[in-house]
A protein has these predicted regions:
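Active-site regions of metal-assisted phosphoester/phosphodiester hydrolases
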Residues: 1-151
Length: 151
């Protein structure tokens, strides 16, 4: 990826939405994060590793910088926007009970699936339906995200 440019971008998006938190906001796209999502840890950033007990721990350093800053950059968007009334619409409807993906790749005999594409919306925007449309035709390496909502 683009290393720290990604984190600087996520930090900038977070600050911009913080300034505009009283507006109706929609933020959607490919964020290339998180690394994992599960019932125990919720969101797991790329700066975290899962220990022997299954708990996510932030690495001291990551990709030539502080792991804490990287984790905060990813976490600020994926779960932190809730502080401004902007939520991940997929998780709002399904919590962490439902696993899905928008991107996948094969590594040897292992298929890795990640939910990199997101739709975030202000609380006043009611999401009625949201789903990833998986298609074998591979127009893109990501699955489109269909979202229906009302204001």
């Amino acid at each position: 990826g683009n290393g720290w440019i990604k984190i600087e971008t996520l930090e900038g998006i977070y600050e911009r939405l913080k300034e505009n938190k009283n507006n109706l906001n929609i933020l959607c796209g490919d964020f290339n994060t998180p690394k994992e999502e599960d019932l125990k840890n919720g969101m797991v950033s790329f700066a975290q590793r899962i220990d022997d007990k299954g708990e996510a721990k932030v690495r001291k350093s990551f990709r030539g910088g502080e792991g804490v800053r990287w984790d905060k950059g990813e976490r600020g968007i994926i779960v932190g926007l809730k502080e401004f009334g902007i939520e991940d619409s997929f998780r709002k409807l399904f919590s962490y009970d439902v696993k899905d993906y928008s991107w996948r790749f094969n590594r040897k005999d292992n298929v890795i699936k990640r939910r990199f594409d997101h739709f975030f919306a202000s609380e006043k925007i009611k999401v009625i339906d949201i789903k990833y449309l998986h298609n074998d035709k591979k127009i893109s390496d990501h699955s489109p995200l269909f979202t229906r909502y009302e204001i």
